[in-house]
From Swiss-Prot:
It comes from Paraburkholderia xenovorans (strain LB400). The keyword Cell division does not apply. The active site is at Y141. GO terms for biological process: DNA metabolic process. 3'-to-5' exoribonuclease specific for small oligoribonucleotides. This is Oligoribonuclease. The lineage of its organism: Bacteria, Pseudomonadati, Pseudomonadota, Betaproteobacteria, Burkholderiales.
């Protein structure tokens, strides 16, 4: 896989406060103070998840010493995916990635409007606040974490929970698309809306 810059084709989305910014990062470990970001990708969708545009997919250069400090799981996972080689070859810094991604996102979402969307997104936000703080400030302070629905579904509707199988690719762009697909799955099978007649009846009763 090579790094991907934002598409120059006709955008499938119009700029809106309601658009959602989806994000995933790969890191050398779990601790923001000692580990580093090695890949970042973003996708913007509309509020109903049926239109999207892919943003930059960037390997972020880190030193050989930093990469050598990864545990065996990360060495194996990011070695198999080719990410380690991409990181070594990359000339993109955290500051470069911040600028490219902010420029892309600004086309589709005003600053401070979209929550940060993804799976276990608080972990990405911790790393972003540490290493890419200007990009972190582009987002609303709220998160849209698909993991919340996952944990509720696992406890309340385990049969539905087992119906979504993750591919566990552990590359940033693939993980974003999987998070979007997972939210669509929960919307269809777990977040059951009230029947229209029942909702209308409740509104009339409130009047």
């Amino acid at each position: 896989m090579t790094d991907i810059l934002a598409s120059t084709e006709q955008p499938p989305l119009v700029r809106s406060d309601m658009n959602l910014v989806w994000l995933d990062m790969e890191m050398t470990g779990l601790e923001p103070d000692s580990d580093r970001i090695i890949e970042i990708a973003v996708v913007v969708t509309n509020s109903t998840l049926d239109r999207m545009v892919e943003g930059p997919v960037l390997a972020i250069h880190q030193s050989d010493e930093t990469l050598a400090g990864m545990d065996q799981w990360n060495q194996n996972t990011h070695g198999r995916s080719g990410l380690i080689d991409r990181v070594k070859a990359s000339t993109v810094s955290e500051a470069d990635a911040t600028e490219q991604i902010r420029d892309f996102l600004s086309v589709y979402v005003p600053p401070g409007k979209s929550p940060m969307c993804g799976n276990s997104i608080c972990q990405d936000r911790r790393f972003m606040a540490r290493w890419m703080p200007e990009l972190e400030r582009f987002f609303h302070y709220r998160n849209l974490d698909v993991s919340t629905l996952k944990e509720l579904c696992r406890r309340w509707q385990p049969a539905i929970y087992k119906g979504f199988q993750k591919r566990a690719m552990h590359t940033a762009l693939a993980d974003i698309h999987e998070s979007i697909d997972e939210l669509k799955y929960y919307r269809e099978h777990f977040l059951i809306p009230s029947a229209p007649d029942a909702a209308n009846g409740a509104e009339k009763a409130a009047e």
